[in-house]
Amino acid sequence: MSTKVPIYLKRGSRKGKKEKLRDLLSSDMISPPLGDFRHTIHIGSGGGSDMFGDISFLQGKFHLLPGTMVEGPEEDGTFDLPFQFTRTATVCGRELPDGPSPLLKNAISLPVIGGPQALTLPTAQAPPKPPRLHLETPQPSPQEGGSVDIWRIPETGSPNSGLTPESGAEEPFLSNASSLLSLHVDLGPSILDDVLQIMDQDLDSMQIPT
């Protein structure tokens, strides 16, 4: 306990100003660590004579502990049996043996947070990825003859390069082109020629002396 005057017995400031919280608190008011005792509940094979800790989860049903005697057969099913070893030991109303239970060679271990139970939790599923637009021209496989023109529709005004697309490969491309998720960009030689002409005009205008 701190030897200083408690907060509620301190007088207010003479000037009427509100005191700050850091002026009222001190390091002596903080208690030291109380230790870390993790083994807070223990129920041994001896039953009531070998247990300590908070056993409020039993709710007064101490007859469920190992090593205790059952008064009569469970006829009306009023007892709640949360432990599997008790359910198997009281089949057909037989009493438990006086000695230590063969099913309980060690003390009962309660579940630990972060133990094997944590591995059974469902993992959060990742959201589905949005569909990607096919902006790049797909590379033809070697089985299709190595022709690049089978993957694009020839333009009506573009000059023919001499490589004619196959008739069998033209139909599936038309069906893919009609899809909203497919986008095919064809930069033909006509657009490239226009870009090169503009670049040449800019170079000529820079070389003309003013």
Swiss-Prot record:
One of its GO terms (molecular function) is GTPase activator activity. The modification N-acetylserine is found at residue 2. Keywords: Acetylation, Cell shape, Cytoplasm, Cytoskeleton, Membrane, Phosphoprotein. The keyword Cytoplasm applies. One of its GO terms (cellular component) is cytoplasm. It is a peripheral membrane protein. It is found in: Endomembrane system; Cytoplasm, Cytoskeleton. PROSITE patterns: CRIB. Transmembrane segments: none annotated. Interacts with RHOQ and CDC42 in a GTP-dependent manner, and with SEPT7. Probably involved in the organization of the actin cytoskeleton. May act downstream of CDC42 to induce actin filament assembly leading to cell shape changes. Induces pseudopodia formation in fibroblasts in a CDC42-dependent manner. The CRIB domain mediates interaction with CDC42. Belongs to the BORG/CEP family. This is Cdc42 effector protein 2. The gene is CDC42EP2.
